[in-house]
Swiss-Prot record:
Biological source species: Psilotum nudum
Family, as annotated: Belongs to the RNA polymerase alpha chain family.
One term of GO molecular function: DNA-directed RNA polymerase activity
Top-rank taxon, per record: Eukaryota
Enzyme class name: transferase
Designated name of the protein: DNA-directed RNA polymerase subunit alpha
Reaction(s) catalysed (UniProt annotation): RNA(n) + a ribonucleoside 5'-triphosphate = RNA(n+1) + diphosphate
Domain comment as written in the entry: The N-terminal domain is essential for RNAP assembly and basal transcription, whereas the C-terminal domain is involved in interaction with transcriptional regulators and with upstream promoter elements.
CC per GO annotation: chloroplast; DNA-directed RNA polymerase complex; mitochondrion
One Gene Ontology term from the biological process aspect of the record: DNA-templated transcription
Length: 340
């Protein structure tokens, strides 16, 4: 990415870390505020950042283990308290830190009796253990435990269902993302007779990177996704598209009848919490008791449904309807017969 090619917007945003704390070696928390956004912008950024944090930020995990004299994952070894399955689960939860994209090899070679922890893993210099006290196994007698490990860096979640071979090799479900959770909320305020918004971002990480570093990486990932659109009007890009024969004739003749706009809204509403409706306490608490946490949850109900809820009177229904209409231009159906 070339910084000079990106025009600097007139609107100047500022950010601030409001709260930062370590709740443990494997749980770091950060809360950030970004403002001022024009009305509607904070929601756009909040949805994108949350999805990028949860799905694009990379992490390092153990993806493979090989034991001696083991047939299947539910085997037990004499002198070891845990089953192979339990040990694999413990290995899966080990928090690692590495900047290398190469597949790394590691191992455990321990003589009991003793507790085996993450600190006992023999690692390459490019990999670091975040919490050396994480439990792996308990050796109760004077026997060795030898395990070969494989470490990889990626994003998201890789499901392999703990498949094993006859030689004691196990491919582990890997949770690569270092993000434990990510939320956002939006608050409006008035500035120079204009409505402006503050975006609050909350990030929890596993300790392999700070919440601030996670936000930076998620931002870079989003920039990489969108930067291609900056040059779409340039003649060079058009020629390149023509040379690659990327035109409408190359697409399948079958028309796509899916309402893309509707699908996009449905996805977005699943990420928008009802806090952003800024409802009075009575209406808000009633919705929470109904397990309504997002706008998507709320849209499963009609006005008639809400009126039947205990302590949810006509006034509360009106407040919900007004908030949905004002903030998201959504008309909550009066009853099931008016649902489009």
């Amino acid at each position: 990415m070339i910084q000079d090619e990106i025009p600097i917007p007139v609107q100047t945003l500022q950010w601030k870390c409001i709260e930062s704390k370590k709740e443990g070696k494997r749980l770091h928390y950060g809360r950030f505020a970004v403002s001022p956004f024009r009305k509607g912008q904070a929601s756009t950024v909040g949805v994108a950042m949350r999805r990028a944090l949860l799905g694009e930020v990379e992490g390092t995990s153990i993806t493979y283990a090989k034991f001696k004299n083991v047939v299947h994952e539910y085997s037990t070894l004499v002198g070891i308290k845990e089953s192979i399955h339990d040990i694999l689960i413990n290995l899966k939860e080990i928090v690692l830190q590495s900047d290398s994209y190469e597949t790394q090899k590691a191992s455990i070679s321990i003589l009991g009796p003793r507790d085996v922890t993450a600190g006992d893993i023999l690692l390459p210099t490019s990999v670091k253990i975040i919490d050396a006290s994480q439990h792996i196994a308990t050796i109760t007698t004077a026997i060795p435990l030898d395990v070969e490990l494989r470490i990889e860096r990626d994003c998201g979640y890789r499901t392999l269902n703990l498949k094993e071979s006859q030689s004691g090799e196990f491919f582990i479900d890997a949770l690569f993302t270092p993000i434990r959770n990510a939320n956002y909320s939006i608050h409006s305020f008035e500035s120079n007779n204009k409505v402006r918004e503050i975006l609050f971002l909350e990030v929890w990480t596993n300790g392999s990177l700070t919440p601030g570093a996670a936000l930076s990486e998620a931002s870079r990932d989003l920039i990489d996704l969108f930067i291609i659109f900056l040059n779409m009007e340039k003649e060079e890009s058009i020629k390149e598209i023509e040379n690659n024969e990327l035109n409408i004739k190359n697409f399948p003749s079958t028309s796509i009848s899916v309402d893309i706009d509707r699908m996009a809204k449905e996805v977005a509403f699943k990420q928008i919490f009802i806090d952003q409706l800024e409802l009075p306490a009575r209406a808000y608490n009633c919705l929470k008791k109904m397990q309504v946490h997002t706008v998507s949850d709320l849209l499963k109900y009609t006005q008639y449904d809400l009126k039947k809820v205990k302590n949810f009177g006509n006034k509360s229904v009106e407040q919900v309807v007004e908030a949905l209409q004002e903030r998201f231009a959504i008309q909550l159906p009066k009853d099931q017969f008016n649902i489009s």
